[in-house]
Amino acid sequence: MTTFYDGWLAASANAQKAVEHAPALAKGSDLNWIETPQDYRIAMLIGEQVGFPTMGTSLMKAEIPAGHHTGKHQHGEEAMHMLSGTGFSVIDGRRYDWKPGTTLHIPFMSEHQHFNTGDEPALYVSAMSMDLDLFVHLGRLVQLEEKGKNATDVESRFGKETSQFADDGRRIALHPEDWIDENARREAQRAAAASSAAHGNGHGHHGHDHGHGHDHGHGDGHGEHGAGHQAHRHGAIYILMGGSESLSDETNGFQAKAVAITNIFEETPKTRSHSHTHTEAMLYVLEGSGYSEVDGKRYDWVAGDAVHVPPKMTMHEHFNNSEQRTRTLRIEFGIRYFYEALWKGFHKVEHRLTAEAIA
């Protein structure tokens, strides 16, 4: 007779096998586009439904035709990044405008709908933890309205945008002109610290901790030297929603808990990023071509592809072997940090702290 304990043992073995033999690359050219009551075109990039073992998380890509809108629905937290098109979203009754490069946060169970008011399709990537929400029986997916063609008075019906922030003070929308250049800010901090020391006023600069209650001092050099003294991990880092791996605790006013589109990483031609090991994260390739090494295996990518770091201690780094810059969008999920705080062995490990040139 098979017992529940036998089932747990079998599930444990299957989970280990799944992450040890997990795919790491989703090709944008191979997506299976579908139509739903909510979306005209949507495809799963990374998720259990397309063969990636995740922590109940997913990354999708969707398209809104010109002059149309999505359905209106409610569900758990969502992070979105607009790739093309112009329009606005109505979230809990308030309008938030968007354009290419805008990052949006949908709070837990907020009513929301997206309107393409431009003359070209609007494309965006979306990250959620829907499978996790439903597994713990706290999440819901409530369809309130179906997709359709915009009304002729769509622009006036919802009024003008009055703020990028919700009534409770949290940020909902962030435009490219408001991205924070983390490397530039660290250089400014470094210069200020050097100037202060030269005038005899310095007491040492220790930078920021991550502001999330995690211990990141496990051989990564952050605790001793701080952000002001460490060389750069990428050619450029732009802070969007901020995250638990950032050298800064800056969140740009977002209050994401379950999912965040944290940063844009830029690698200059013929360079590679820092090398490290941690559990689940995702990258979406915005621009350029290159490759990632995940547990020693090479995965070549181009714009539109996505990289999955599976939920085990996975060593990885990213390479730009081209003559043009690359930009990738980093996505993290709160469930990762819940488990990292529980399990002492699952802290982030740095193998090489800085980006460097390649042949």
Regions flagged by a language model, labelled:
Residues R41-E48, S58-Q74, M241-S248, A260-T277, ...:
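Conserved short histidine dyad/triad with adjacent acidic residue
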Residues T57, I64, A79, L83, ...:
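Short, structured motif recognition centered on aromatic/hydrophobic residues
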Residues P65, I91, W98-G118, A127-M130, ...:
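Conserved metal-binding segment of the jelly-roll/cupin
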Residues Q230-Y291, D295-A306, H318:
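Structured core of small recognition/catalytic domains
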Residues W98-E161, F338-E340:
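Hydrophobic, ordered structural segments
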Residues H68-P100, S110, S275-A303, T314:
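A short beta-strand-loop-beta hairpin characteristic of the jelly-roll/cupin
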Residues A281-Y284, K297, W301-N321, T326-I358:
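C-terminal functional regions that serve as terminal interaction/effector modules
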Residues M1-M55, G139-K257, W343-H347, R352-A359:
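A short, N-terminal "cap"/entry segment at the start of jelly-roll beta-barrel domains
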